[in-house]
Amino acid sequence: MKASILSVTFFALLAASQPVAAQSSNDWENWPTGDRWRIGAGYFAPDLDTAIVVTDTGGNIGTGISFEQNLGLDDSEGTGLLNIDWRFFKRHAVSYRYFALDRSATTSGSTVTIAIGDEVFDIDLPIQSFFDITAHEVSYSYSLLFDQKKELFVGVGLSLQDLSLGIQGTESSPNPGEIINSTLDSTAPLPTLNVGFDYAFSDKWLFQSRLGWLAVELDLGADEDLSGQIINANAGILWKAFENVGFFAQYQLFDVDVDFVDRGVLFAIDYDYKGPVLGVSVSF
């Protein structure tokens, strides 16, 4: 009889303790850094620096061309950013990042020689150019350190840089009067190694930072190769003004240096976008 009473008591206590244990195991969801979902949208106002050198199939190296200084593209054009983070377990999370920026211009009267391989543009006649980029990044992170005040995480990611660029104008040499039309349309899949650190000053104020970097060489298929490196970094402050809505201010850097070989033509491209981001964040 005593054994039966003890057994019933034991299982009753065990059953009663389950909700408490379950609640305790998920206490991290109430931490300032413990949001299951966080979706952010911001306005990115970067300084833009885009350069290219094209080497033709004969090995003739063209001039270094700045899209902003030599071709007239805007050097400070804003765009939107989208961030989505999902913490599916306490120490495991996946993220998605997106931005796009399209620019075009027509210029004439350049003060420097502009050449694609051995083809030299007539700089006294109009030269049309465009540089469009769409970036998608997906990543996974694991929290090495995660408590009520701070989080240190590492992870891996893949940044898909969809590039489309072109320069069109009239040739001055070696074939005066002919039209030069040099374009590139390619997607650069650049993997990254990531590290980040977040710190909660209080329940409403958080410091957030993230760095992604990697250098890579890839064979993209017949007559197409890619090598390059990417730096993707940001740091800033998140203010959780309301229970599920916050506002953030951060500094963002995209620095990509890639060499494309497309049908024997080498495009060496370096683009550097850096500046402030202001946005709103929804968490739940």
Located regions from the model:
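Cleavable N-terminal export/targeting peptides
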Residues: 1-35
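Short glycine/proline- and aromatic-enriched beta-strand/turn motifs that initiate or cap beta-hairpins
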Residues: 22-101, 136, 281-283
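Repeated loop/turn-to-beta-strand initiation elements of outer-membrane beta-barrel proteins
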Residues: 91-94, 148-150, 203-207, 243-247
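Residues on the lipid-exposed face of transmembrane beta-strands in outer-membrane beta-barrel proteins
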Residues: 41, 82-86, 138-142, 156-160, ...
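Surface-exposed extracellular loop regions of Gram-negative outer-membrane beta-barrel proteins
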Residues: 198-215
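Mid-length scaffold segments of soluble, non-membrane domains
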Residues: 187-191, 201
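Transmembrane beta-strands of outer-membrane beta-barrel proteins
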Residues: 40-44, 95-99, 155-159, 210-212, ...
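Extracellular/periplasm-exposed beta-strand and loop segments of Gram-negative cell-envelope proteins
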Residues: 49-77, 100-134, 160-188, 216-227, ...
